[in-house]
């Protein structure tokens, strides 16, 4: 697991502290229409040249524009239809939970074209609600929770999401948790091969109060417990910057996630 962070927030590039992987190089060399306006500049090691992480799938497919992926009402007070996790062990319920102004959780689940639920579009954006209790900030794996989902820019009703209907496709799950009061953001994601993860597709985690030098705790069951993640976890980053809520934040996050997902799937 690797860690990178920036203290400077939204208006500065995120500086990678590692060499580019083959997938990262391939992604940086892509020149499709940029998923406007989402780009993030990175310093290319050994060159001193900024490169853009484009919000496009590594397989060449494209997501819709940022505007079409945003709900009409977002963040504070938002309650949307979502994926129903009730069919998987440890993933119960579909009761909507509203976000609040202090601690928000954001989840991104990326499905490769050959993946599950073939009757619906293959580009999937999942924005998850959060727990408001102090001990369990994060994806609900043991409590009732609704997971709003956007299919190709449009909101659709609950869709069953269980190991039995995942098919042969690979899901990459990304989770972000943020504390507005401290400006602390944490992102965790894992590669959910069905052979390695069968009863949970998004691993729960907790986020303690931390400074820029502290790492977040990953693992657990979503109820405050902390346990080691399995080998399917590919990466984690902590971005303790005072980001403003809204489209600009999502632009930065999504562009970066696309760059990281390129490494996972490429």
Locate each region found by the language model:
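Short, solvent-exposed beta-strand-to-loop segments that form ligand-recognition rims
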Residues: 189-213
């Amino acid at each position: 697991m690797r860690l990178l962070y920036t203290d400077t927030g939204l208006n500065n590039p995120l500086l990678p502290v590692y060499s580019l992987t083959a997938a990262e190089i391939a992604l940086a060399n892509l020149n499709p229409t940029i998923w406007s306006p989402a780009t993030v500049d990175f310093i290319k090691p050994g060159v001193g040249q900024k490169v853009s992480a484009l919000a496009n799938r590594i397989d060449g497919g494209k997501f819709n524009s940022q505007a079409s992926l945003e709900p009409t009402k977002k963040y504070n007070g938002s309650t949307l239809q979502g994926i129903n996790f009730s069919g998987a062990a440890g993933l119960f319920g579909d009761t909507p939970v509203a976000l609040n102004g202090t601690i928000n959780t954001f989840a991104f689940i990326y499905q490769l074209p050959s993946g599950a639920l073939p009757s619906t579009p293959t580009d999937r954006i999942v924005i998850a609600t959060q727990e408001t209790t102090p001990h369990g900030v994060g994806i609900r794996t043991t409590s009732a929770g609704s997971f709003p989902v956007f299919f190709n820019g449009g909101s659709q009703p609950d869709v069953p999401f269980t190991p039995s209907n995942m098919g042969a496709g690979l899901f990459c799950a990304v989770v972000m948790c943020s504390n507005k009061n401290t400006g602390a953001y944490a992102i965790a994601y894992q590669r959910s091969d069905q052979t390695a993860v069968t009863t949970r597709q998004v691993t729960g985690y907790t986020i303690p109060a931390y400074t820029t030098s502290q790492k977040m705790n990953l693992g657990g069951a979503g109820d405050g417990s902390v346990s080691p993640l399995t080998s399917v976890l590919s990466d984690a980053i902590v971005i303790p910057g005072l980001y403003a809520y809204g489209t600009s934040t999502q632009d930065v996050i999504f562009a970066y996630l696309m760059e990281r997902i390129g490494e996972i799937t490429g």
